[in-house]
Design a protein with these regions (language model features):
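Local sequence-structure signature of Cys/Sec-based thiol-disulfide redox active-site neighborhoods
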Residues: 1-24
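A generic structural signal for alpha->beta connector loops
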Residues: 3, 28-32
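Thiol-based oxidoreductase modules, predominantly thioredoxin-like and allied folds used
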Residues: 31-42
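A short, hydrophobic beta-strand/beta-hairpin element that forms part of a small beta-sheet core
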Residues: 53-61
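Non-catalytic, surface beta->alpha helical segment in thiol-disulfide oxidoreductase systems
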Residues: 60-83
Length: 83
């Protein structure tokens, strides 16, 4: 099963919105979600800083700030074709 990772911050409204979109898409598209909070992790804060939420599909960068459902579905399909 595909793994979607979302790097988030606590009390981040964009992060909450992105996570909600992913949860809705998961029902139809069948993937797992792993949410990682970057708060307090110096390396992740340097890497992602103000770009959160950052989404990865199977470990590869997908997008940041928002999850566009159409773009996400397209990217997930491309990942599945190359597996």
């Amino acid at each position: 099963m595909d793994l979607v990772t979302i790097y988030s911050r606590k009390e981040c409204h964009l992060c909450e919105e992105a996570f909600t979109v992913l949860q809705k898409l998961r029902a139809d598209l069948k993937f797992e979600i792993n949410e990682i909070f970057i708060d307090g992790d110096e390396d992740l804060e340097k890497l992602y800083g103000e770009q959160v939420p950052v989404t990865l599909i199977n470990g590869e960068h997908h997008d940041y700030w928002k999850v566009n459902p159409v773009r996400f579905k397209s990217s997930l399909e491309k990942h599945r074709q190359h597996q």
